[in-house]
Amino acid sequence: MNTIELTPLRKGIVGVQFLFVAFGATVLVPLLVGLDPATALFTAGIGTFIFHLVTKGKVPIFLGSSFAFIAPIIEASKMWGMAGTLAGIAGVALVYFVMSALIKWQGRKLLDRLFPPVVIGPVIILIGLSLSGSAVNMAKDNWTLAFVSLVTAILVLTLGKGLIKLVPIVCGIVVGFIVASLMGEVDFTKVHEASWFALPGSLASFHWPEFAWKPFIYMIPVAVAPVIEHIGDVYVVSAVADKDFVKEPGLHRTMLGDGLACLAAAFFGGPPVTTYSEVTGAMQITKVTHPQVIRIAALTAIVFSVIGKLSALLQSIPQAVLGGIMLLLFGTIASVGVQNLIQHKVNLNNQRNIIIVSVTLTLGIGGAMLDFSLRGVIIGILMVSCLVYANAMKQGLVKVLLIILGGIALSTLIFFLLPGGESELTKMSGIGLSAITGVVLNLVLPKRAEEEDA
C-alpha cells in the first residue's frame, strides 16, 4: 500500500488521531494494576521515541501499555511491592535484548525458517481476531453509542473527501462523545477536579527502582508472548506500509528498541510497553503510514500526560464509543493476514499447510492456555529437537521412530528427576502459544520434495 503524502498540518491532525486510538488501552492498563495513567502516557511517548531512534525513524510503530503483564504485575506487587516489580520489568527488557542479539547473529535465514508465510499469515489474522473480544466487550456497554461511532467512521471513510477522509476515527469518537453527552452517559467530574498542568505521579515523586533478583527472574518467562507478538506486529506493519521492515532496519533493531522502551518505562514508573495493533489498524484504513505521524502521536501523549484536564477529558470518553471504532480497526488487521497468505501464494490445498494454519487459528481463537513448569519446558524442547532432527535427516521410518523413542526415553528420565506441578514457570495463551505452535508444526512436519524445490 502506498502511503498518502500529507502537509505538516495534516500529519499533525492524523498523529493526534492515532493517539486517540491508542489512548484507551494505554491508560486502562495502569488503572488495572495500580499505576498512574498519566505516567503510562508519558512512558508510551518516551518509549515510542526511543523505538524510533533505534530503528532509524523508519518503522511506523506506536508503543503503549502492554496487557500481557496485567496479571504478573498484580501478583508480583503483592510479593515484592511495586518498586520491586518495576525493577523486575528489566527482566522483560533482557528477553528482548537476547532475541535481538540472536536475530542479528543468525540473520534473515533464521526468521524465514521459523516464520514462513504459512506461519506468519495466521498469526497476523490472530492479532486482529484476538482483539475482537475486547472490542465487543467495550461496545456492549452501550450498543447505541458503539454503532453511532462505527457508522460515523464508516461514512467518513467511504464518502469523505480531503482532510475529513483522513480522520474517520476522530470523527467517529467526536460524534459518539456528543451523543453520549446528550444521553447523560459522560461524567465530567474528573475533568472539573483535574488541574491544568501537573507532572505525572511517578515523576512528581520519583524514586529509583529497587532491584531484586526474584521479580527480575519472575518476569522473564512472561515476556515470551509479547516478544512473539512483536514479530507478528512488525510483519503486519510491513504489509500495511508495503515495506520490508524485517530486512531494513531489521527485526533485531525493532526488538532492541522495544526492549529499551520497556527499560525506560520501568525506570519512570510505568507499565511495560508493546507494539500497538490498534494504531496499525488505523494506518490500514487511513492509508497513512508516515513514521513522522507516529512520532507526532508520541509527542501528543507526552503533552497530554502533563495537561491534567485534557487527559481527564479523554478518560471520560465512554468505552462503548471507543469499542465501536475498535470493531472496525481490529477487523482490518485480520484482513492483512488473509492478504499475506494470498500474496505469498500459500497453497491451502496442501495438507501440511492446512494443518499448520488450522491448528494455529483454532488454538488462538479458542483461547487455549497452558501452564509450563521447568520440567515441561525442558521435555518440550527435547521432543521438538528430536522431531526436527528426524525431519532434517530424512531417514527411513525405522530410524525416525528410533530417534523419537530416544527422545521419549530421555523425557521420561527428566520427568522423574525434575519437579513438576508445584514449580510452575509461566502461563502461555493467545498469540504467543499459537505462534509457537505454528513454528513447531512448520519445523516438524515433513515437506514433500516438490514443496522444497518451490
Where are these regions (language model features)?
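Membrane-embedded helical hairpins/re-entrant loop segments and their flanking transmembrane helices
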Residues: N2-L9, G34-H52, K58, I220-P291, ...
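Interfacial segments of multi-pass membrane proteins
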Residues: P72-W80, L157, V279-I294, T300-F304
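Intrinsically disordered, low-complexity non-transmembrane regions of multi-pass membrane transporters
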Residues: M1-I13, F188-L203, A239-V246, R253-T254, ...
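Juxtamembrane interface elements at the cytosolic ends of transmembrane helices
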Residues: G24-V27, V151-V156, V167, D187, ...
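Membrane-embedded alpha-helical modules
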Residues: M79-K190, A298, V303-E452
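Short, non-helical or kinked segments that cap or interrupt transmembrane helices
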Residues: L35-L41, G57-F69, L111-I120, K165-V170, ...
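N-terminal signal-anchor module of multipass membrane proteins
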Residues: M1-I61, A68-M79
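Hydrophobic, membrane-embedded alpha-helices of multi-pass small-molecule transporters
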Residues: G12-A22, L145-S149, V167-P168, P200-V234, ...
